[in-house]
Amino acid sequence: MFYDLKNKKPKNSGENWVAPNATIIGDVTLEKNTSIWFNAVLRGDIENILIGEGSNVQDGSVLHTDPGCPLKVGKNVTVGHLVMLHGCTIGDNSLIGIGAVILNKANIGKNCIIGAKALITENKVIPDNSLVVGSPGKVIREVSEEERKAVFENTKHYQDNWKKYSKSIF
């Protein structure tokens, strides 16, 4: 469902898929080849939310902002199931693991993997190519080439999968 709010209207490239029970509110931009899965909520009622080309937001995730804290998801990013993103920036080609929480003004670099249930605190900067686990999240090493390829394959799966869903769910 798409909802306008206070003259803020979601912008949809039209070349993507939004599950019938996902909720997109206000100042949200969906670039092409994105997918927003079941029960996800993207609430752009305070600041802008941008979902970059080729990215996916999986089931039950919540994306929100605060004043002065817009939310940007880069290109080809996987936001796993039940993730909470709040007023943060996610770099291109990154994977945010199941149940992770990333808070205001945190900045996740490109090609990062944020492990399941990780907590990235406010204002935390995660360098490019980092593998982060724990609560609070800590960089434990660089992402390997094999892991980078696996992230790409996961993202590609969701880019292909939404096209199947768009033809079978009405």
PLM feature segments, named:
Residues 157-170:
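Charged phosphate-binding loop/patch that engages nucleotide di/tri-phosphates or the phosphate backbone
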